[in-house]
Curated annotation (Swiss-Prot):
GO CC terms of this entry: chloroplast
Lineage per the UniProt record: Eukaryota, Viridiplantae, Streptophyta, Embryophyta, Tracheophyta
Cell compartments where the protein resides: Plastid, Chloroplast
Loss of function: phenotype: Displays wild-type growth rate and unchanged starch amounts and distribution in leaves. Starch synthesis, starch degradation rates and starch ultrastructure as in wild-type leaves. No change in starch-metabolizing enzymes activity, including SS1, SS3, branching enzymes, debranching enzymes or phosphorylases. No change in expression of SS4, PTST2 and PTST3. No effect on SS4 localization within chloroplasts. Larger chloroplast starch granules than wild-type. However, in most chloroplasts only one large starch granule is present, in contrast to many in wild-type.
The protein's name: Protein involved in starch initiation 1
Subunit structure: Interacts with PTST2; the interaction is essential for the initiation of starch granules biosynthesis in leaf chloroplasts. Interacts with SS4; the interaction is essential for the initiation of starch granules biosynthesis in leaf chloroplasts.
Coiled-coil segments: 128-309, 345-432, 457-512
Amino acid sequence: MGFSQAIRLNLASFSSPSPCDYCLTRVVNHKQKSLVAFPSITRRKRHLLLSVQSVLHNTRPNINDNGSAESANVLFDKLFARTHRLERQTNQHSVYPDDDDLPYSNLGVLESDLEAALVALLKREEDLHDAERKLLSDKNKLNRAKEELEKREKTISEASLKHESLQEELKRANVELASQAREIEELKHKLRERDEERAALQSSLTLKEEELEKMRQEIANRSKEVSMAISEFESKSQLLSKANEVVKRQEGEIYALQRALEEKEEELEISKATKKLEQEKLRETEANLKKQTEEWLIAQDEVNKLKEETVKRLGEANETMEDFMKVKKLLTDVRFELISSREALVFSREQMEEKELLLEKQLEELEEQRKSVLSYMQSLRDAHTEVESERVKLRVVEAKNFALEREISVQKELLEDLREELQKEKPLLELAMHDISVIQDELYKKANAFQVSQNLLQEKESSLVEAKLEIQHLKSEQASLELLLQEKDEELAEARNKLGEVNQEVTELKALMISREDQLMEATEMLKEKDVHLHRIEGELGSSKLKVTEAEMVVERIAELTNRLLMSTTNGQNQNAMRINNEISIDSMQQPLEKPHDDYGMENKRLVMELSFTRENLRMKEMEVLAVQRALTFKDEEINVVMGRLEAKEQELKKLKEETINDSEDLKVLYALAQERVGEKTMGDLAIEMLQLEAANLEVEAATSALQKLAKMSTELLTQADMSIEADTTHTVMPERGYSEGSNECLGEVKTEVVRLWSLTEKLLENAGIVAGTSTCMEGVIL
């Protein structure tokens, strides 16, 4: 009914004046207006069509008229397609106002389609009304049929009650007859059932005994597997120890190779320094030669000028020929000296090139050695990785062993459960045997009871023997655990002693550092004295400069006097002769005066260079002293931190010892409980063994972790000390001999102390039975 009302409402909406007609009249009257209102009208129409279509799709089709429903759906699909086309056309032609007649031609088609759809809807409504009427008539028919069926069921139930009463009476009679027969047969069946129960119990006992034997065999096999795994573990541990020994040997070889490389590098550095000095000397000699060649060229120019003047005045300069010959001899001597100096330069250059070739060869050899050392280091790392993989395998084997032990314990628990079940089933068997013996013979019952009691006594005796053996085994294990605890206590005492030795060595290192500080103070005092000496040298240089200036003034005055004398001469010949004599005398006077002037200039330059060099050395030494002081403070802080860590480790060791003592007391308590429960065969023995093994494993792991932490601390100390020493050595730049020797001695002592610390840590590790991969750390420290 609700469906028909919805359709009627939709039809009423269509019977009202349609928006399409309104739109058409408005467009005819107002063609000059725009089509702005048309999309809203089409949207309303689309909404109405969508509502109609939703109603049509939600309705149920008629039973007899499927074709009409399908035709209505097809019509509405066509309507929707045309409305979509209209919307598209309106959207396309809304921009162009000239094409107004296109959508209105389509609106007429839409109206015809709507009318056809309304006709189809009316037909559909009539069909639905017919279907509702048919459904009501069918319901009435069904109700009538139900009433008739209920009446028939009542009659059938009454007849069945009568039939059941008759059957019950017959059954009672049969039951009475059968009960009498059953009482007779039950007595026979009791004997048979007792016999069958006895056979079933015997078969179940045999099966359970077989299961017990199988479980025992499995336990024996598992114990064999555990022993095999333990033997494999021991063999792998031996292989690991051998591999560690080989690694240590290889580390020693690497250390020797590194020492050789360091020595060669030092030699190369020394040779480079000598090469630099020689190059500087060559440069100085070349500069001197250039100066001499320039002077020689100047002298040659002067000689040529003199020759020209002498050619003009041959008649007057016979006396001066001897002087010119002397000058020529001097020039030839200078020429020979220049040639010899050039040859020496060429020879020194050849020597330098040969030395450079030798140095290049040595560098190539060093690079090859470095490559070999690097390859060797890689092989060592590979060996370490293999060792670690073997350790992982060993841990896996240990885990498997632990799992096998757990399985064995579980199987033993199952065995005990089976034994308890057997003990529970034994009284049932005894009752069955007792009943059978009452039926058959009392003598047979007594004999069976006697055999059962004998079997029980034998089982109890065997259980007592096994309990005694287990108690002895537990006692032996307790003694071994006590010995292990004593050994651990001794190892802890040794570790404490070694820690005391380490502390003593740290104090010794502090004393060494204090002595090195004193040496640094002495070096600073020496540097101050050198500063005073340098100031003195500067004063002397100033006085020498004053003397040079005074000499230059004297030479200038002599030159002025000679010029005045030359101007006073009137005669030409006498003037020329006097000029020649004066020039010769002036040259002879200036030559000895110029030589000391040049010597003073060279000395001044040399002294200035020495002053600058000494100042730079002093600055570098001051920087080195500051760096050493910083390094000392940093090392003191590191030593304090390490001491704090060592104290923390001692506290951890004390805690571990207390825990081991508590574990031993717990083991003793468990052992006492096991002694009290000797008469019963329980899982307490295995629990005690497992607890003992776990306690021992915990002790070993705690000791190994503590020792590994100590080793890490020592390696960190060593690496930090070595890095600080390397930083100090890199900042130093060729100090004087005394100071360099003192610093080298200090470095040697520090390295010896570091090696001692490392040897102590290795001894600790060897005493604890740990084979850790600390060789790589030592390699980094030595490098």
